[in-house]
Regions:
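N-terminal secretory signal peptides that target proteins for export/translocation
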Residues: 1-4
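Sec-dependent N-terminal signal peptides of Gram-positive bacterial secreted proteins and lipoproteins
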Residues: 6-27
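A structural signal for short coil/turn segments at secondary-structure junctions
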Residues: 12, 195, 223, 379-380
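N-terminal non-catalytic accessory region
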Residues: 28-203, 210-265, 393, 405-406, ...
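Short hydrophobic helices that act as membrane-entry/anchoring signals
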Residues: 88, 543-565
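Alpha/beta-hydrolase fold catalytic core
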Residues: 164-178, 306-402
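Alpha/beta-hydrolase-fold enzymes
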Residues: 255-350
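Alpha-helix boundary/N-cap detector
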Residues: 284, 288, 331, 350, ...
Length: 566
């Protein structure tokens, strides 16, 4: 890996794809709060948090390690590599690109320079691991042990039961979810053989939900016979805007959205943001400064290079991973394929034919049939439940950054179909009144943002406001455990949660506590860490000038306060 300052150059060039991906990087470990005693093994499968290594045992670079690129541990004082790296990207941009409208050299060098940072984490052009990368030996050994040895606990009376954290299914989260589903089936079979049980339960989160959905698609009979219940938390099966829109041309740089995202990160303890930064972003957003700064570059350059730059960034970072392609929404899929691989018959389509075959197979087998796959599983006897989280700003550069979300995916997607308002507007009074008149009042959230009646499984979908995508609280685990292990289909009327809609008080990182939940009411539902206001967009010119002046003076006060603060 090259010098740290070259890494910084790459970091700056990849910020659009990387920045918000750091959001789920600090999932808080929790201690189990016993809720009930399951008579079947419970399999846990999570997202992309598992550390991967190469053939020499070195940790593979992960976006969660992005902060480490600023450490100058290999800095020998020689700036030649810095200049070469920058020149390799800027020269073709300025000369062949801007002067002669030939952008191919720029795309090629952009992909090459950034790809060196992510080299060992990239899959090859067939979607297979390189450099001997994969799971750590100790994870493989642990899985081998638990799959072949009964992990049951016993009560003082000798009754056998299973807790929620003994059967972790570890996997290389970059790979094709359908291939991983084959491994999951084998894991289930071995557990059944070693325990003598006839069924298991499954708790899945984030990318793990794609693996489980693929398993249900490929092995429906096996699931019907051997899976009692499936519980999803923070699902990305229907797509995740931050991964889907980033490669389908849906960019909308929004300073106010960036500010809201920073306030969220500050509130949940990811990092501290100086209030002056927030005030500055407010000023940039409310005065229209950012829009004016970007107007000319956007007009002259953006539309000419967006597809080529998207392809270069995607294939040098995260999109040789079929697992991330599984998070592309059905609506964005065709556009994303063209942005990243070019039109049918293109050179890149041929070059990446093996990878594309896996991506398209998942699309044909899973993505295009998700409602049928899940309803089919339920009809075959598999119990199913969903937790959808919200109360946070999604990726600030997403075109749909106005949707209510868990930072990663919108509620409409993670809940499999809830009708929602936006961060700017609740569902209209007319809509809510009509739904109540039609008998759906119980499905409406007290904050006026969600109608759960349109979910794929409205009776077994729960909503938690104030818990982010990266937070897996004990309160969620209680419910997930019950959904997966219960001998009957659990519903919102008979679960351990006090309501279909709950509010979560986020854990203070400095306190040894996992927070609390309570039934949502009109009094406690205002949990957002910011106020979203788009009134300026529809204001007349005079109103905009007045607001800009007020914001400008507010920023000057904040600046002087910071400069002369004692």
């Amino acid at each position: 890996m090259k010098k740290s300052f070259k890494k910084i150059t790459a970091l700056l060039l990849t910020v659009l794809l990387v920045g918000a991906l750091c959001l789920p990087a600090i999932a808080k470990p929790t201690e189990w709060i016993s809720q009930s005693l399951s008579d079947i093994p419970i399999i846990r499968i999570s997202g992309d948090g598992e550390k991967l290594i190469d053939e020499d045992g070195n940790k593979v670079f992960h976006y969660k390690d992005i902060g480490s690129v600023f450490k100058n541990d290999d800095d020998d004082g020689d700036d030649k590599e810095t200049y070469r790296s920058i020149a390799n990207i800027l020269k073709p941009f300025l000369i062949q690109g801007l002067m002669f409208n030939n952008w191919d050299p720029y795309y090629e060098n952009l992909q090459k320079e950034i790809g060196e940072l992510f080299e060992h984490s990239l899959l090859d052009k067939n979607g297979n691991p390189q450099y001997g990368t994969g799971l750590r030996p100790e994870r493989i050994e642990k899985m081998e042990n638990v799959r072949h040895h009964d992990q049951a606990w016993r009560t003082p009376d000798g009754v056998k039961y299973y807790v929620q954290d003994r059967y972790w299914f570890y996997y290389d989260w970059r790979l094709d979810p359908i291939e991983t589903a084959d491994e999951l089936k084998a894991f289930i079979d071995d557990i059944l053989a070693s325990t003598g049980c006839e069924q298991v339960g499954i708790i899945a989160s984030c990318l793990g939900t794609n693996v489980v959905t693929a398993y249900l698609a490929v092995y429906p009979e096996h699931a019907a016979a051997h899976v009692r219940g499936v519980a999803y938390d923070g699902s990305v099966t229907m797509g995740a805007e931050m991964l889907s829109e980033a490669i389908s041309g849906k960019f909308n740089i929004d300073a106010a959205a960036i500010n809201r995202a920073l306030r969220d990160c500050n509130a949940i303890g990811m990092f501290n943001v100086d209030e002056f930064v927030n005030v500055t972003l407010d000023m940039v957003a409310d005065t229209g400064l950012l829009d004016n700064m970007l107007a000319i570059p956007k007009k002259l350059v953006y539309y000419r290079i967006v597809k080529g730059a998207t392809s270069a960034l995607a294939l040098s970072t995260f999109y040789t991973w079929p697992s991330y392609w599984a998070c592309v929404s059905p609506e964005d899929y065709d556009t994303a394929m063209e942005y990243v691989f070019g039109p049918e018959g293109s050179e890149k389509r041929t070059e990446y034919a093996g990878l594309i075959a896996k991506i398209e197979n998942y699309n044909a087998v899973v993505r295009q049939h998700i409602p049928e796959i899940l309803t089919g599983a339920v009809q075959s006897g598999v119990h199913f439940g969903v937790i959808s989280k919200y109360g946070f700003q999604t990726l600030p550069i997403c075109e749909t950054n106005y949707l209510i979300s868990d930072q990663f995916a919108s509620v409409g997607r993670s809940s499999f179909g809830a009708t929602t308002g936006t961060i700017y507007e609740d569902l209209s009074d007319e809509y809510l009144a009509a739904r109540r008149e039609a008998g759906f009042g119980d499905y409406l959230s007290p904050d006026g943002q969600i109608d759960a009646s349109t979910c794929l499984f409205p009776e077994s979908t729960w909503f938690i406001k104030g818990s982010s995508h990266s937070n897996w609280s004990d309160w969620e685990l209680r419910l997930l455990y019950d959904i997966a292990s219960s001998k009957e289909q659990l519903t919102v009327k008979d679960s351990c949660w006090p309501s279909r809609f709950v509010v979560y008080s986020y854990t203070n990182p400095d306190e040894d506590s996992d927070g609390e939940i309570e039934a949502m009411t009109t009094e406690n539902c205002d949990t957002e860490n910011w106020e979203a206001d788009d009134s300026a967009k529809n204001a007349n010119p005079f109103q905009k000038v007045i607001k800009a002046i007020k914001v400008w003076f507010g920023w000057l006060r904040a600046l002087f306060d910071k400069l002369f603060r004692k």
